[in-house]
C-alpha cells in the first residue's frame, strides 16, 4: 500500500514523478490503515495537463498537481496551506509570508538553521491549538524534515509598501493578506470556508506586519 504519514494524516499516493517519489519516501508509513486522502493523477488528466503546459516536463506537472490536490484536501481536516516559511523557535514556530510582488523570497533573509518548513507548510487545528507541518510537497519538498510539526504562535506578513516597522495587525489589515497567501491553493468555492477557518485561527494566532527581515532576531523576539 502506498501509504504515507503527512501532516498527521494517512495519505495514499500514486505517482510517477521521480521528484515526488524521492521526497515522500521519508514519510512512508510502516503500518496498514484506511487512508484519509488518496492522491492520484489519471493518464487522461496527465495528457490534458501536458497539452495545457507545453514545454513543462511531466515530472514538474505531476509534482505540482499532486501538491495542489494535497492542499485542497487540507480544508477537509481543519487545515489550510499557506505560502510562507515556517521558522522554528524553542517551543513553537512563526510563519513568515511575503507577497510575490515583493520581489524576494523570505528564505534568503532567514538563517537556514531556523527554517523547518519551506514554501508551503500545512497548518492544521488539533485540539485547541494550531500546528504547522513540514511536508514533502512543492518545489522545495526535497528539503523536508520528515513531517515535523510545531505549535503555531504567529504569522508575520512582509510588505515594504505597507509597513514601516514591526506592528501587530488588526483584522482589516491581515484578512486580505492572509487570503492572498492561501489563494493560490484554494478553489473559488472554498473562499467562504477559508474565511471561516481564518475566523477561528485569529483567536489562537497573532498577526504582524513588517517592512523587511533585516532585523530578523529582533522580529523573532517580539512576535
Name each model-derived stretch.
Residues 1-95, 112-114, 121-223:
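A noncatalytic interaction/capping subdomain that flanks phosphate/NTP-handling catalytic cores
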Amino acid at each position: 500500500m502506498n501509504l504515507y504519514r503527512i501532516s498527521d494524516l494517512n495519505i495514499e499516493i500514486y505517482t510517477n514523478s521521480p521528484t515526488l517519489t524521492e521526497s515522500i519516501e521519508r514519510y512512508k508509513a510502516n503500518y496498514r490503515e484506511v487512508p484519509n486522502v488518496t492522491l492520484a493523477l489519471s493518464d487522461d488528466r496527465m495528457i490534458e495537463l501536458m497539452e495545457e503546459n507545453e514545454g513543462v516536463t511531466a515530472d514538474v506537472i505531476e509534482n505540482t498537481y499532486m501538491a495542489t490536490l494535497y492542499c485542497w484536501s487540507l480544508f477537509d481536516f481543519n487545515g489550510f496551506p499557506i505560502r510562507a516559511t515556517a521558522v522554528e523557535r524553542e517551543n513553537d514556530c512563526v510563519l513568515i509570508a511575503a507577497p510575490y510582488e515583493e520581489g524576494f523570497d523570505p528564505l534568503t533573509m532567514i538563517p537556514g538553521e531556523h527554517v523547518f518548513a519551506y514554501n508551503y507548510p500545512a497548518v492544521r487545528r488539533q485540539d485547541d491549538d494550531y500546528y504547522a507541518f513540514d511536508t514533502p510537497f512543492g518545489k522545495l519538498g526535497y528539503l523536508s524534515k520528515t513531517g515535523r510539526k510545531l505549535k503555531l504562535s504567529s504569522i508575520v506578513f512582509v510588505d515594504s509598501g505597507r509597513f514601516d516597522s514591526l506592528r501587530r495587525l488588526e483584522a482589516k489589515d491581515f484578512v486580505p493578506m492572509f487570503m492572498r497567501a492561501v489563494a493560490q491553493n484554494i478553489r473559488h468555492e472554498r473562499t467562504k470556508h477559508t474565511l471561516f477557518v481564518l475566523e477561528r485561527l485569529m483567536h489562537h494566532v497573532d498577526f504582524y506586519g513588517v517592512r523587511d527581515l533585516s532585523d530578523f532576531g529582533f522580529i523573532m523576539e517580539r512576535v
